[in-house]
Amino acid sequence: MLLEKIVEAISGRSEDNGKKVKGTIVLMKKNVLDFNDVNASLLDGVLEFLGKRVSLQLISVVHADPGNSLQGKRSNPAYLEKWLTTGTSLVAGESAFDVTFDWDEDIGVPGAFIINNFHFNEFYLKSLTLEDVPNHGNVHFVCNSWVYPAKKYKSERIFFANQAYLPGETPEPLRNYREKELVNLRGNGNGKLEEWDRVYDYALYNDLGDPEKGKQYARTILGGSAEYPYPRRGRTGRKPTKADPKSESRIPLLMSLDIYVPRDERFGHIKLSDFLTYALKSIVQFLIPEFQALFDSTPDEFDSFEDVLKLYEGGIKLPQGPFLKALTDSIPLEILKEIIRTDGEGKFKFPTPQVIQEDKSSWRTDEEFAREMLAGVNPVIISRLQEFPPKSQLDSEVYGNQNSTITKEHIENTLDGLTIDDAIKTNRLYILNHHDILMPYVRRINTTNTKLYASRTLLFLQDDGTMKPVAIELSLPHPDGDELGAVSKVYTPADQGVEGSIWQLAKAYVAVNDSGVHQLISHWLNTHAAIEPFVIATNRQLSVLHPIHKLLHPHFRDTMNINALARQILINAGGVLEMTVFPAKYAMEMSAVVYKSWVFPEQALPADLIKRGVAVEDSSSPHGVRLLIQDYPYAVDGLEIWSAIKSWVTEYCNFYYKSDELVLKDNELQAWWKELREEGHGDKKDEPWWPKMQTRQELKDSCTIIIWIASALHAAVNFGQYPYAGYLPNRPTLSRRFMPEPGTPEYEELKTNPDKAYLKTITPQLQTLLGISLIEILSRHASDEIYLGQRDSSEWTKDQEPIAAFERFGKKLSEIEDQIIQMNGDKKWKNRSGPVNVPYTLLFPTSEQGLTGKGIPNSVSI
């Protein structure tokens, strides 16, 4: 207290007896969040003592200053109090500080404030609450932003009160501030962006390769071409490489966590213990050379499924090498334990995945194989078979005849007495079709250590609602040229002898296909990559005052950061994904080819289900569609979640937009949608399917899709990764040899030791360790996760009707949770648990921290 008085005396600040308005600032000091910066607090204390403090000025929402371009009138500066005594301690490193403003009647009601940080270090500003503003009451400002020292900024830092305004309704004293803040966030498109920058801008995916390391590390630039279209990523402004001026230079691996994203998109708000788990993605990368060296010199194999189970039950000894020793010597033990699940004896050990918790072998059944297409980690691919045999959409002049060779004779005896025509007419035949996506790449992929087929799997919907596979077709390009078509072989179910072992291998080749398509398309492309342009455009074109910004902003949390980290250490040349998924160096290029068929309106769940033929439009059904597979857990729960999101968005948008005319006249909204089409998804700008954004319905539909992608769709394809793929034999990521042919040693091994033959075909031991390490982290919920129906502040808006609508949304989600629990307990719904007895909870809205196999975070945050 005495110290504060001395500071006031030195700096000439003292109390006067005029009218005051008190406020409370909530913030986190840098030293709480940055364990490497022990000097942060000391330096700021010195500056505080010298009078260089944190100042705030209120801005009037009702009275303009004629001498300042009619911008809102400003109050005299006020200063944060008791910085040296740290303020009142709150949760998770937060502190509350008092600030007292000299009240000027000319201010009227404050609608914004300017903050200047004259300290040496940045701090994380959570909120400001003004108490008892004369003739008004309390005013709340939600900030959630890093405030760097004022000298780092070219313009003032401004924060607005929690009252939403459409652009045309903005009070005149705030209008100029609103527009200038958007200009600041857009930047000027030039130069390298620094840590403290807040610039949102676009770039191509031209930073995945590292051509300066050699040709083998060069990668195709994604985006900006008809051949390889792609959504845009956030710009970093790093220099081009010397080897290829079109490619952006990369930062060193050790600096991965410092890759540029706008400062408020960083993981800085995550508590330190969780932050280390994100760092794992980077540190695991250092293990790769060691893994590779071991793999080259001692190609260790799992000899049996018992060997694989040791990963979870007893641990597996990690072979020692110089690189690993250097790593263990240089990393603190507690971090190393987190990274490699070591038990102190250098063993990898992992949590037991749900798929083998109840039964160690049920994953091998045909029923479970099929069920996971409806309730597993990739339930978004299966479609209804509408013509037989299945036909290819590939260009026959380039690829020859790629139509299926499955015949009636292959499957009619497994259709419960139905003919194929009857089965198709009664919606009983379905297909998991990876043929056309993969065939153009199979020849190139098979020049590597991977040996891959393009697959088609036919399934029959049985009377009890379960599916059974009835045929698997594995295809290779013709050895004499692509134009000669496919060389295919059809396999049918068997459970005894060598035929049974061959059938198990056929399912494994399908699982390999599905694993790669899941990771690259269903997961990365359709959620992570597709949503990033919406994050960028929203921050560039919609003011924080805009109601649609307030609606969408929670669904963008951490997305740019996790995507930037992915570019740095996961999807880059030689990264973890290339090492663990079969397309290897062709992985991202393949996803760009698939993006050609991406259609925004088809990302809506009902539209997707109809497109795949697993549902039909039906106005009498609760969600406007009728499922043709009644026991389809992803679709059943998904439609409930979709409907809840749609109702919430409808109520919210109807409150702010009373007519279509307001949508048309909203200049920020129109600029946002134009930029999304022409810049963010610029390679799709001329597509006729884009909503015109001329009506309230188009706005509501588009916002519902955006929220669905960021929340429920991502949850459905992400958080089941460890529960199902944490046991690699169930979802192998690689196949290393072709199907054994009679008369070969491999065929004899298949007869005498089928389990070993299976394990020698799929992902090898070291890639298994790496892959499991990765998906364990990707499947975890952070302790500060915010789930669908939740907000990080109860004061997110001043408008009471949207608050009430949001509460109804939360209540509806709670009812859906009860419904999921009830259905999972009803034995009638066989696909909800299956032979492995893993209840379907991937669309259960809430979750605890950790590896739970449930929970829908608001955003693509991991």
Swiss-Prot record:
Induction: Up-regulated within 6 hours after pathogen infection, ethylene or jasmonate treatments. Not induced by wounding. The keyword Cytoplasm applies. One of its GO terms (molecular function) is linoleate 9S-lipoxygenase activity. This is Probable linoleate 9S-lipoxygenase 5. Pfam families: Lipoxygenase, PLAT. It comes from the Eukaryota. Residues 36-161 form the PLAT domain. Gene3D superfamilies: 3.10.450.60, Lipoxygenase-1, Domain 2, Lipoxygenase-1, Domain 3, Lipoxygenase-1, Domain 5, PLAT/LH2 domain. Plant lipoxygenases may be involved in a number of diverse aspects of plant physiology including growth and development, pest resistance, and senescence or responses to wounding. May contribute to cell death during the hypersensitive response (HR) by the massive production of free fatty acid hydroperoxides. Catalyzes the hydroperoxidation of lipids containing a cis,cis-1,4-pentadiene structure. GO terms for cellular component: cytoplasm. Residues 164-862 form the Lipoxygenase domain. SMART domains: LH2. Its EC number is 1.13.11.58. It comes from Solanum tuberosum.
